[in-house]
Amino acid sequence: MKKLKKFVTKPHIFFRDALNNKYPIINNEQGIKELDERAVLSHQENLEKLESSLMNTPIPIDVVFTWVNDKDEKWQEKKQHYSKLANNYAFYAKDNVRFEEHNELFYSVKSVQKFLPWVRYIFIVTDNQIPHWLNNEDSQIKIVDHREIIDHDYLPTFNSHVIEANLHKIPNLSEHFIYFNDDVFVAKPLKKSHFFKPNGLASIFLSIKNLDKMYAKGTTTPTLLASMNSRRLLRKMYGQELNIQTPLIHSYIPLKKSVFEKIWSVFKEEIESFLSNRFRGKNDLNLATFFVPYAMYLEGKSVLTPEICYYFNIRSANAKAQYKKLLQKKENGNRPHSFCINDTSSSNNHFYHKNFNTFINLYF
């Protein structure tokens, strides 16, 4: 009777809902339908309140960013020099779009400071560069040079996997930290327990993608190859029957320094074998974004957690529609946890940078 009443009184809503049920809109990599987002968010918030009432352990949590300013002439000269010498690099490894900067870091850091006020320190790992907007009086933000955490034999490096493999060496880094790429933005206020439960368990945010299916389609990106290399070592450590098929979503990643150190102690030789790849290579391992999170899960130190992260390409034709949707959700109080505005070389749309800046200024 309710459906019949809706059909008679509000036919436009009836047909809209019918279409959404048959062809659901999905904005995230976990397969959560847009119609279900509010219910998922509400349920998760209720669980977090319950957990906080059970125990409230003061866990210090840091945030770590990796960042490069591709406009820096000295950095450009280094990249050009070593690019000519590189031979064992993977597809897209030297593509300029991988290093292109749209001032995302400023807004990503701003989103952390605005929506995660409980964060202790924000570390920015970079190659002898300092963001132009950084206020020296902001004691929360710490600049970490590559030389502080990476052996000089492997420098300079333009390989994100090499940089990420050494994050646990950041001086004064907390046991519990959250790794960010600068294209990931916190979209709303979030509690500590979204990342680390009061009992110390971390969250792991898995996608519904499939590694083997992507490989079968010929999607042999450096990230996919590194994930499959890491999976091989995980099976060696935890059992060949291990059926890991899904990567993590493109969002922030809760990590434990002690598990990083354990992986290094067990697979030191395998890790060091790819550190000389100045650009992403076919034998890379992606410790921060796959290996360590899965090791944490297999060690019983993390749990599967819903994460509604809107993920889209900054240059795509769909980007403006996603910007509009995120601003609407901000207004109606139905914001996702986060959003990732990825950059790939899918088009030469010259307006994408202007559209991004217009949106991001309105959102924050």
From Swiss-Prot:
One of its GO terms (molecular function) is transferase activity, transferring phosphorus-containing groups. It is an enzyme of class 2 (transferase). One of its GO terms (biological process) is polysaccharide biosynthetic process. It comes from the Bacteria. Keywords: Exopolysaccharide synthesis, Transferase. Its EC number is 2.7.-.-. This is Capsular polysaccharide phosphotransferase fcs1.
